[in-house]
Amino acid sequence: MNRLFVAYKPPFVSSNAFLHKIKKRYRVKKAGFSGTLDPFACGTLIIAFGAYTKLFRFLQKYPKRYRTTIWLGASSPSLDIEKIESIQDVPPLDERTIKDIINSFVGEFTYIPPLFSAKKVGGKRAYHFAARGKQIDLKPVTSTIEEISFVHYRHPFITFEATVSEGTYIRSLAEAIAKKLGFPGTLSYLERLAEGKFVYENENPLDPVQYLRTKQNFVKKSKEAIFHGAKLTIDDLAYKEDGEYHILFDDFFAIIRVEKKKVRYLLNQIPRKYQ
């Protein structure tokens, strides 16, 4: 079975455990997902079966949109509710002040990633060190906050939505907002609403071609020649600029890369029929 769809991961289950349940329900062996969600988080998870598991790196999955709630006064080394260490009383805040501070984060956002994260340090994930109480130095990263909007405030909980670039840690964004308000804070809720055009719609099958980030190209060679991996030259292509392209036929497609006037296949014989 070849299928691409968006599932909705519930909270307090790992993305891998959720995929295992999906595989059992659909009775498939070859399956994968893109964009790991933290166990406590919920929301959209892109799932693929069969040949479509090869497509993840060619899909347009950005920007990503999240809805999240900050618990003001709560402190956690993981910046979420799974490792709460202390809770302090926080006086009620002015809603206008909260909105202004949230809105101030639009644009570039530079921060240190959470210690409990998948960032690599010396070839190992940061969370391996954090779980053992070892101190490590993570380098600052810069993300782009494309949009951010206040949703509501029910003291001591602040909910907002944000559209962000690849690799943004919402936990760090929430912590920075809380600090600017003058208090510690951690996430009590995190939901991924969308990844690019990918949104949850009852696991309906998607046409992968509509979600590719590559540009369509056209070739002089026959469908049969491309299917069998015939060598391509730059003169065979309609678009000759460096980049990655997809070539469509009625029942399959290929993905190629053009670099310094050389052409090579990245994928081929990907079925267009999906279930």
Curated annotation (Swiss-Prot):
Name this protein carries in UniProt: tRNA pseudouridine synthase B
Could you tell me which Pfam families the record lists for this protein? TruB_N
> Where along the chain is the active site annotated?
38 (nucleophile)
Q: Which UniProt keywords apply?
A: Isomerase, tRNA processing
Q: Which domain of life is it from?
A: Bacteria
Q: What role does this protein play? A: Responsible for synthesis of pseudouridine from uracil-55 in the psi GC loop of transfer RNAs.
What biological processes does GO assign it? Answer: mRNA pseudouridine synthesis; tRNA pseudouridine synthesis
Enzyme class of the recorded protein, top EC level = isomerase
